[in-house]
Amino acid sequence: MRRKLRIALVAHDNRKADIVDWALNNAEMLSQHRLFGTGTTGTLVRESFMKRGIASDITCMHSGPMGGDAEIAALVVRKEIDFAVFFIDDLNPQPHEADIQMLLRQCRIHNIPIACNRYSADLMITSSLWDDAGYVPKDPIYAPFDRKAFEESLKVKE
């Protein structure tokens, strides 16, 4: 991949081992990009890379419950993140659920791809679209739906 990406890494406590393992499996690729992590997640990835002699550019924010999710969301809003990997613990309640939902919402609103499991993270990081200069992601359409106009647009023009 030629383009240097800005990638956010976030994981709940019960998913931290999973995201570190994913990062190590993708270390060659990730080491070429700028990484942003919530406090503990970013630190764990950085330490795992350092122990293996892998150079990395990782900026650690606060931990999620202390505002790290909100800091990542602010980067998303400013278009300073190209994609996010957020391994969520769906089996246990989180004390900072509002911040989690805010981060997910801002990614959706600002059209920033977010992977919430390993498979989607693998697909995202290996996508050829990152280097396709002709590909321009279309912004989401937030407008009232006009069914009549939509159906008219589908008609074949002769």
Curated annotation (Swiss-Prot):
| Top enzyme class | lyase
List the GO cellular component terms: cytosol
Q: Where is the signal peptide?
A: none
Q: Does the record bear Transcription in its keywords?
A: no
| Pfam families, per the entry | MGS
Q: Name one GO molecular function term.
A: methylglyoxal synthase activity
Q: Which CDD domains match?
A: MGS
Which GO BP terms apply?
methylglyoxal biosynthetic process
Where is the MGS-like domain positioned along the sequence? 1-158
Q: Which InterPro entries does UniProt cross-reference here?
A: Methylgl_synth, MGS-like_dom, MGS-like_dom_sf
Q: Catalyzes what?
A: dihydroxyacetone phosphate = methylglyoxal + phosphate
Cite the SMART domains for this sequence.
MGS
Q: List residues binding substrate.
A: 12, 16, 38-41, 63-64, 96
Keywords, A to Z?
Lyase
- Give the enzyme's EC designation: 4.2.3.3
| Kinase in keyword set | no
Positions of the catalytic residues: 69 (proton donor/acceptor)
Query: Record's family?
Result: Belongs to the methylglyoxal synthase family.
HAMAP family, per the entry = Methylglyoxal_synth
* Primary role: Catalyzes the formation of methylglyoxal from dihydroxyacetone phosphate.
* NCBIfam families according to UniProt: PRK05234.1 (NF003559)
The molecule here is called Methylglyoxal synthase
The organism of origin for this protein? Treponema socranskii
